Regions:
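Conserved N-terminal subdomain of the carbohydrate kinase-like
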Residues: 48-133, 313-323
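Active-site metal-binding loops of divalent metal-dependent hydrolases
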Residues: 10, 134, 163, 260
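Conserved phosphate-binding/catalytic region of the ribokinase-like
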Residues: 2-5, 150, 206-323
Length: 323
């Protein structure tokens, strides 16, 4: 039995890590992919997890398999393909740790997962299925993702969705919006970044955009909206909460911050979904998730940099003492 299974991309983040003596950019190969980042944090929170996806039968694919397995995630749903290479994402960061992406994915193994390769037995043994839109950018992997979602729905699972919009990977932003709409329409848990929310709703004013979202997707029991250094907010039933981010950390790379946050919210929902909660409890969820997300930005390579619960609580306590 798994608490959370995720389907989607597993890839190599080629993260900029300085300059050589002759002025050439140096890139560091780190394991990445939003779904597995989410699972890695859930493992730290004591959850049992499994992954469904595809990598190339190459040095990167084998490295990823070993790393994901060593993080505690079951890889019974991981498929190797000898005909296509593992996807690479080159990541440049600015002075704030924010990122620009260049993807080598034409095609990449993650987008070639077929629906007949989806391990439905793993899904049926899970409580939650988590997914994003990178596994819906192309027809082959979209069919696999839809099969996973339909299997999850038929088996009574909760669905968790993070759009994780990457415009360079879409041939049409209209199609991207359609897939975000689909993901939101089938899920009980949605974590969305503020610019993604504006893109989906067509509304720049945050409160109005949330109102539009909640009207369009009454199925979403827990909605969280992240805004980077501006903090986050959450909506659960008729309760609203917000919390600032933790700025007293030395940010190196924001890769995986949203995934870390998302994992903490999934964990909270597994404990509290369906219960009556107070605003303070919802805010505590955000504080914990914000702290975890802040800590993961202090290192490169999110999947291998997920914080321990003790470190998260220590940061929260340190912040309270400084207020």
């Amino acid at each position: 039995m798994f608490d959370v299974t995720a389907i989607g991309e597993l890839l190599i983040d080629m993260a900029q890590s300085g300059m050589s003596d002759i002025g050439s950019s140096i890139f560091e190969a780190n394991p990445g992919g939003a779904p597995c980042n989410v699972l890695a944090m859930l493992n730290k929170l004591g959850r049992s997890t499994a992954f469904i996806g595809k990598v190339g039968d190459d040095i990167f694919g084998k490295k990823l398999k070993n790393i994901v397995e060593s993080s505690g995630t079951d890889i019974g749903g991981l498929v190797f393909d000898e005909n296509v290479r593992t996807t690479l994402a080159f990541v440049e960061t600015d002075e704030y740790g924010d990122r620009n992406f260049s993807f080598y994915r034409a095609p990449g193994a993650d987008m070639m997962l077929r629906e007949d390769e989806v391990n439905v037995d793993i899904i049926k043994q899970s409580r939650v299925l988590h997914f994003g839109t990178l596994s819906m950018t192309h027809d082959v992997v979209e069919k696999a993702t839809v099969k996973a979602i339909e299997t999850a729905k038929a088996s009574g699972l909760l669905l968790s969705f993070d759009p994780n919009l990457r415009p360079p990977l879409w041939d049409s932003m209209d199609r991207a919006k359609q897939k975000i709409d689909y993901g939101c329409s089938v899920s009980e848990i949605v974590k969305i970044e503020i610019d993604e929310l504006r893109f989906l709703t067509g509304c720049n004013e945050i409160n109005k955009a949330v109102e539009i979202f909640r009207t369009c997707y009454p199925n979403v029991a827990l909605l969280t909206v992240t805004a980077g250094r501006s903090g986050s907010r959450a909506y659960y039933k008729n309760i609203y909460a917000e919390a600032p981010t933790f700025l007293n950390v030395k940010t190196i790379d924001t890769t995986g911050a949203g995934d870390t946050f998302c994992a903490c919210c999934i964990d909270w929902f597994l404990n509290n979904g369906g219960k009556e909660v107070k605003e303070a409890e919802l805010r505590n969820m955000l504080v914990f998730a914000n702290a975890a997300a802040s800590l993961v930005t202090c290192k490169k390579g999110a999947l291998l940099s997920m914080p321990e619960i003790s470190d998260i609580n220590n940061l929260i306590k340190e912040n309270e003492n400084n207020e």
